[in-house]
Amino acid sequence: MDMKKPKNIYIVKYAETGTDGWAYGRPAGIKPSQWPRSRVNGVPMAHIFTVKIPAEYNVRGSDVEYLSVFQSSDFEDDEEEGVNEFLQEGSEALDNNAFWQELVLYRNNMHPREVYQVDEIGGGWCFIYLTEEEVSGKLSELPSKNCLPVDYESMHEINCFSCDQPARYFNLEPHSDDPNVGIKPEEYPDWLEAIEAIDSLKVEDIQGYIPIFHEVSEKLDLNLDKYFNNHHFGGTAHPAQSIPDELSEFYFEFDETLGDPNIGGDGVAQIDLLTNKIHWACG
């Protein structure tokens, strides 16, 4: 996809009167029956955050302006028989009890812009892209608790009921001083090998992405860690381990202080807005 390169990064700044999104809380613009479900056990996922996508990072068109992120963290939970096949493959419901009735209602009313993803350890995530009109409506009501399987138990208790907390609102603050803005992140850029031994480096020698703690950054005093530990769109990545392969420059990076997702206790995650892939690692 031929996209215009962003010229700014955008960092999250919490504010009581923030207008660019919120962590925790409930989503807006979806019905209780549209609340994303785990493909492992059918339980409604936790809402992690909703964020406005800056125009420079909006790869989906002008009608879609917000991204709501949900997590189930169900990688160690017991599988509810038939749920994955029902939701992912269109198979038949296995029962007519309250749990399956709620699951049928969800499948028949799924939000048209819901995207389901599985992370590297098998945990489920959902992204819902929302319009300004949808987000400007009232916050969503929780699904009925009839939607829980009989004898439901979770290893991590990350679902819409256990994680129903007051919202924390925020603004997005633009910055144009990140040298990596608009550049695809790479862990080992080829161009750096040819110049890293040069003592008299100049800013004009920069030919591509520079990892956050690379010695070239120190030689040129680029201050790439200026926004370290900030949730942000684009620019210099701050992964807990290495930069994910094939991560585009159109990404959002966050850690567990944004809505309390389960990403290893000290993890950092990246959502690639071009591919809808989520990556995360912990230290």
Regions found by a protein language model. Give the residues of each.
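Preference for intrinsically disordered or flexible, low-complexity segments
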Residues: M1-G283
